[in-house]
Amino acid sequence: MTKQKPVVIGVAGGSGSGKTSVTRSICQRFTETSILVIEQDYYYKDQSHLPFEERLNTNYDHPLAFDNDLLIEHLQQLMHNEPIEKPVYDYKIHTRSKDVIHVEPKEVIIVEGILILEDPRLVDLMDIKVYVDTDADLRIIRRLMRDIKERGRTLDSVIDQYIQNVRPSHLQFIEPTKRYADIIIPEGGQNHVAIDIMASKIEKILSRGL
């Protein structure tokens, strides 16, 4: 368990922008015992009280879909070197699972998600704020591949969701948060120069004991 205040890094960007690749690249620069990733996707609101048909209409790209109160509470606990029980979201039933994941605090905490820079309360907790900027055509291709392969979605359903929710929400809520980023990374995890700069900054913060 770490004693000093952890370094909190926010990695934002549109769906399919390469946030996970950036996060993975950063993690490779540090030991597993020193870095922790908290995905905003785990903090979608519990919808177990709603009929399944209503859950199907959830706009997962809207700020109101997230339980930021719980995410903030958990981040504050980790920053005070306290463990948390991280929720698990089940996309097949469109609500929170009964399972939780026990998470211990570490020196570096990466918070990754499409809308982590949208909530000022989250932004205030971050030492470094990153926005991964990727062209829309590449983002939709990546989302298609992910949702069909990993979430059992059909091609038609993914395209319909993109037109109805993903694209409008990106333009209205996600893209504008770029202005709050300290670092904007084009080309995602392939931008090794940006990754090197971030890793150096993290190391400097850790060495100062901030």
From Swiss-Prot:
This is Uridine kinase. The keyword Kinase applies. InterPro entries: P-loop_NTPase, PRK/URK, Uridine_kinase, Uridine_kinase-like. Keywords: ATP-binding, Cytoplasm, Kinase, Nucleotide-binding, Transferase. SUPFAM superfamilies: P-loop containing nucleoside triphosphate hydrolases. It comes from the Bacteria. Its EC number is 2.7.1.48. GO terms for molecular function: ATP binding; cytidine kinase activity; uridine kinase activity. Transmembrane segments: none annotated. GO terms for cellular component: cytoplasm. It is an enzyme of class 2 (transferase). Pathway: Pyrimidine metabolism; CTP biosynthesis via salvage pathway; CTP from cytidine: step 1/3; Pyrimidine metabolism; UMP biosynthesis via salvage pathway; UMP from uridine: step 1/1. HAMAP family: Uridine_kinase (MF_00551). Its main location: cytoplasm. It catalyses: uridine + ATP = UMP + ADP + H(+); cytidine + ATP = CMP + ADP + H(+). The gene is udk. GO terms for biological process: CTP salvage; UMP salvage. Belongs to the uridine kinase family. Coiled coil: none annotated. ATP binds at G13, G14, S15, G16, S17, G18, K19, T20. It comes from Oceanobacillus iheyensis (strain DSM 14371 / CIP 107618 / JCM 11309 / KCTC 3954 / HTE831). It is found in: Cytoplasm.
